[in-house]
Amino acid sequence: PHPSGLGSALTHPSITTDYSEALLEFITPVSASIAETERALQNLHLYTVRQLDGELLWNASMPCIVHGDAGIPIAQFGTSNVGQMKRIYRNGLSVRYGRKMQAIAGIHYNFSLHGSFWAEANKLAGNLKSTQALQTDGYLALIRNFFSRVWLLMYLIGASPAVCASFVQGNPSHPLSLIHI
C-alpha cells in the first residue's frame, strides 16, 4: 500500500501514485530553472526515502521481477467519488493493456516559454498577429516537429536497455519471448 508517511495519494500536492501502488509519482512545482527543479526533485526523493522504512526505490523504467498481474496491485485512492473514478480508470487500463504494461515508469514533463519570449518573438515577426496567436501557433509547430521525429527520439532516449524475462513470460507473441538465455 501507499506508505502512510507520504500522505494521501489522492490529495498530496507533490507525491501520488501512478498506476500501481508501487509506482510513485513525484510532482515538482513550476520553476524558472533546471537547478530549481532538480532541487525540488531531490527534496522529494529524500523525504520519500525516509518514509519507506528500508524499502528501496527502483530507478529503472522497466520493472524488475514481475510475478504476474497479482504482483502489480492497482493503486487505491480511497472511497471518494474522485478516488473511485481514478480506480475505475486504472481498472480499464488493466483490461485494455494488461497490468504489466502499466508498471513501466516514465518521465512526464510540461514546459512553457516565458511570456516575454513570445512578446519579443512577436515584435521580431513584425506584430502581424496577436502575441497569444503567435504563442499558440508556436506551440503547435513545436508539437508537429516533435511528432515528425518521435520515432527517432523514442529510439534514442525512450528505449530501455534491459528487460527482465518475467516481464514477457506467458506472452509468446512478444518479440522478446523469442530470446532464450
Residue ranges and their predicted role:
Residues 88-174:
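Internal, well-ordered domain-core segments that constitute the primary functional module
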Residues 179-181:
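Conserved small/polar residues in nucleotide/adenosyl-binding loops
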Residues 1-94, 101-103, 134, 138-144, ...:
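Terminal catalytic/cofactor-binding subdomain
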